[in-house]
A protein has these predicted regions:
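Internal catalytic domains of large membrane-associated glycosyltransferases
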Residues: 201-488
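Conserved RNAP core-binding helix
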Residues: 45-63
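A short, charge-rich alpha-helical start-of-domain segment used by transcription regulators
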Residues: 6-36
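N-terminal membrane-anchoring/stem segments of glycan-assembly enzymes
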Residues: 106-221, 500-530, 545-552, 647-679, ...
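Membrane-cytosol interface motif
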Residues: 214-232, 566-582, 683-692
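Cytosolic/matrix-facing juxtamembrane and C-terminal tails of multi-pass cellular membrane proteins
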Residues: 331, 667-734
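Basic/Trp-rich segment in TM-proximal cytosolic loops or flexible interdomain/linker regions
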Residues: 126-158, 174-183, 212, 216, ...
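Σ70-family region 2.3-2.4 aromatic/basic alpha-helix that recognizes the −10 promoter
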Residues: 67-97
């Protein structure tokens, strides 16, 4: 608009100069003179110029014939007064070119609106230095020394170490000529050594960063926007789930800012009885506690795309209500302070879309889970620090115990469907890595809050359950090999995916490495490599594998509180030794399992979506079936070595030995008695056992409150037509009731008249054994029972007392 007005003004002025029109009327002459003066100042809007000129002239000599010189003097005075009102004492210092540009852009404020002019001036450059407004300025540029990206630095050190070790092996093998089999063997070595080197590098970075005095600045306690605490579940133990949620709700209610949260339980359970158990536990949980932090329960009618689809459906329906969401797993437990701090940090960093909290393992009872706990407690913080520094703002997402910015998630994280059929095509199983990569691709930051504590998860207690979980994760991680080459992903996101897939491919690669190495050694007329080279390579390999454990041990020993929390220096050292020996013992078993998993996936096997068992009740036959293949492989290996390569029997004993003993080893690893025996002597002790957090104790105490009694189960079975039909279908056909007709009639009438709580265990058993009685009771109960209590708890359960504070 200003440009059009300026063009019209120029055309009018040019026309006047060409025609040399004489101006005879004094009033017209004065108005024209004032208009030209205002136009010269910079007002390009001719209509505005004429209006102001007429106003000034008429106000100069009202009722008399104005003179041009008086009108100009009045105009100059008006301009000076206006500029002084806007700029104060510095009005005379205004750059004229700046003033012309300002008046051309904002003619509406001139000589009329002082406050509006002041506001416009504030965003229109520097009036005294003559600088143009920011949108018309060149931006200051700086030339900094180029720095290599962190992902490149992170791969450089492992790459150099791996290249050196591989070159040494190839050089030793090539003394008598390098065969194709030897070249393949060297490539397999490079893969395994490189993967171990990345772990060593990450641990080393985390180890040295632990001595840094730099601390994350404290956040300011401000009012938080509305946020959701979301827990997706599928056929989980409802007592466990809702006890943890009540404990977290209590913790949030005591934390400043915690009242900004609302809790959601997102169920995908399909078993009607499981769903009824969840609803019973929810009714009890929702009826107690702090009403300012509401708890909601939702069960999907159709559970598409598993956990990722469960969360996606929630965010699409209700995500607009929340700025942030903290996502939990069914075994998650987080302090209220940790939950609030995650959101506060995201509030202070508007480019962060996802903030992952470190995970602490707890509640392990078996030897297997306690050994994993110890490894995570000693080396976990160091690895987390190293990964946080290496990945920087392109960190990874573990799938739970993390805060997300809902708008960024909705904007970037609609998971695509991979071309082709499962297992490597179709829906993406491991959504966490992919969501982090999509956020980074869109320019958002994904970070790890490595300094936080108070965020726990549980491990599968037995070896078969651990392998079953790895089966699901492996298929998802192998899909990542396709996603990692997608266009636009950040380099660090590709590294996360490739390393994650390599961790599962390491099993079959290691087995192939052992087989080819044994064949080469058995068929060679001389030793495959000299003893000196073999010793150097073995030492380098041991360093990469044991280095992280040693660094973690040193770091924990140097930290007084951490050392004492692990039982003291002696017990800590013994625990690390026991854990290292245990890990080396079960490594061949996991190698065979991962090999079978990868081969099954490559042959088209598709994982089934089953519930995660979190109890250490592994049956003997389950372990026998799981470890039978490993046992057979171990027996075949030692037999073939004895027949064709006897000198290698002792060398490869650490591999075939555990395989031969796979079944008893898996039994011991999955047993609670072995874990408790070591715990009795203080071995494998972790801080969560020596000083259990109040939140963990509270969640354990609350389980008794969320546990359903038999009368509640019986009530739901009678009232719910789906549960009733499922129960009747399981009864043997034409089976006689458990009691006499008279006993059955008395139980039916008592149930109809007094309700489920009045029945004894024998009466409930009698009624549930007779299909016709259950159908009759279903009709009568809806007529006579107070069914309002079916939807809301009739009795308000009393919370157990909170643990006394120290």
């Amino acid at each position: 608009m200003a440009t059009d007005a300026l063009t019209s003004s120029v055309e009018l002025t040019t026309s006047r100069l060409r025609t040399h029109e004489p101006i005879i009327d004094p009033g017209v002459r004065a108005t024209r003179r004032v208009a030209e003066y205002l136009h010269a100042l910079g007002i390009a809007d001719l209509a505005r110029v004429d209006l102001l000129a007429e106003e000034i002239v008429s106000a100069t000599h009202p009722g008399t014939e104005p003179r041009a010189e008086d009108a100009i003097a009045a105009a100059q005075l008006r301009v000076e007064q206006f500029l002084h009102a806007v700029f104060g004492e510095r009005a005379t210092e205004i750059d004229p070119l700046w003033l012309r540009a300002f008046l051309s852009s904002h003619p509406e404020h001139f000589l009329a609106d002082v406050e509006g002019a002041r506001t416009a001036v504030a965003s229109f450059g520097d009036p005294f230095a003559g600088r143009a407004p920011a949108h018309n300025q060149f931006r200051d540029q700086q030339l900094r020394r180029m720095r290599a990206p962190r992902w490149a630095l992170g791969l450089m050190a492992p790459g150099i170490i791996t290249a050196g070790a591989t070159f040494g092996l190839v050089h030793a093998l090539s003394e008598n000529g390098l065969s194709a089999a030897e070249l393949v063997w060297a490539c397999l070595f490079a893969f395994l050594f490189g993967l171990a080197s990345i772990g060593l590098f990450t641990a080393t970075v985390g180890f040295f960063s632990g001595f840094s005095r730099r601390r994350v600045p404290a956040t300011v306690a401000t009012q938080l926007p509305r946020s959701a605490l979301v827990m997706p579940i599928y056929h989980e133990n409802p007592e466990h789930v809702f006890a943890a949620l009540i404990a977290m709700r209590e913790s949030l209610s005591k934390t400043p800012g915690g009242d900004a949260f609302e809790i959601f339980v997102l169920s995908d359970s399909r078993d009607p009885e499981k769903a009824a158990e969840e609803e019973r536990a929810f009714r009890r949980a929702a009826s107690v506690g702090n009403a300012t932090i509401p708890m909601y329960y939702r069960r999907r009618a159709k559970n598409e795309r598993q956990k990722a689809g469960n969360l996606a459906e929630f965010f699409e329906r209700w995500g607009h209500r929340y700025t942030y969401a903290v996502i939990l797993d069914a075994d998650s437990l987080m302090r209220g302070e940790t939950i609030v701090e995650l959101v506060r940090r995201m509030e202070a960093a508007p480019r962060v879309a996802l903030l992952q909290s470190p995970l602490e393992l707890h509640r392990g009872t078996t030897l297997f889970s306690r050994a994993q706990q110890l490894a995570g407690s000693v080396s976990g913080p160091m690895f987390t620090r190293g990964l946080a520094l290496w990945a920087d703002d392109q960190a990874n997402y573990y799938g739970h115990n993390a805060a997300v910015r809902v708008s960024a998630l909705l904007e970037c994280c609609a998971l695509p469907v991979l071309a082709g059929q499962p297992p490597l095509g179709g829906h993406i199983l491991s959504h966490d890595f992919v969501e982090a990569a999509l956020l980074c691709r869109a320019g958002w930051e994904v970070r790890i809050a490595h300094d936080l504590s108070g965020s726990w998860e549980e491990l599968p207690p037995t070896l078969p359950e651990y392998v079953a979980r790895d089966r699901r994760w492996c298929q998802g991680n192998l899909q990542h090999l396709r996603i990692a080459v997608s266009e636009g992903l950040k380099p660090m996101s590709r590294v996360h995916m490739l390393v994650g897939a390599a961790a599962y491919l390491a099993g079959p690669v290691w087995l192939l490495f052992v087989i080819i190495g044994a064949i080469l050694a058995a068929s060679s007329a001389t030793t495959l490599v000299t003893p000196k080279v073999a010793l150097i390579l073995a030492g380098a390999t041991a360093l990469t594998l044991l280095g992280p454990r040693l660094l973690g041990l040193i770091s924990t020993l140097a930290n007084g509180p951490a050392r004492r929390a692990h039982g003291g220096a002696v017990r800590l050292v013994l625990s690390v030794i026991v854990e290292g020996v245990f890990a080396a013992t079960i490594a061949p078993l996991l190698m065979v399992h991962h090999t079978r998993i990868v081969l099954n996936i490559l042959m088209g096997g598709v994982v089934s979506w089953g519930a995660q068992s979190r109890r250490s009740t592994g049956a003997l036959m389950t372990i026998v079936r799981a470890e039978l293949v490993g046992t057979v492989i171990g027996v075949l290996m030692v037999t073939l070595l004895g027949l064709f390569a006897l000198p290698l029997v002792l060398w490869l004993a650490p591999i075939w030995g555990p395989l031969v003993l796979a079944i008893p080893l898996a039994m011991i690893a999955s047993s609670e008695w072995a874990g408790q025996a070591l715990s009795y002597f203080g071995i494998l002790r972790v801080p969560s056992e020596t000083a259990t957090d109040d939140l963990v104790l509270r969640a354990d105490d609350l389980r008794s409150m969320t546990t359903s009694d038999d009368s509640a189960r019986f009530r739901d079975m009678v009232l719910d037509p789906v549960l009733l039909a499922a129960h009747v279908a399981r009864l043997p056909k034409n089976a006689a009731p458990a009691g006499t007709p008279e006993q059955l009639e008395r139980a039916r009438e008592r149930a109809r008249r007094a309700g489920p709580t009045a029945l004894s265990a024998a009466e409930r058993k009698l009624l549930t054994s007779d299909a016709e009685s259950m159908r009759w009771l279903h009709r009568e109960a809806w007529r006579h029972w107070p069914v309002e209590s079916w939807q809301l708890a009739r009795e308000q359960p009393q919370l157990p007392p909170e643990p006394a504070s120290a």
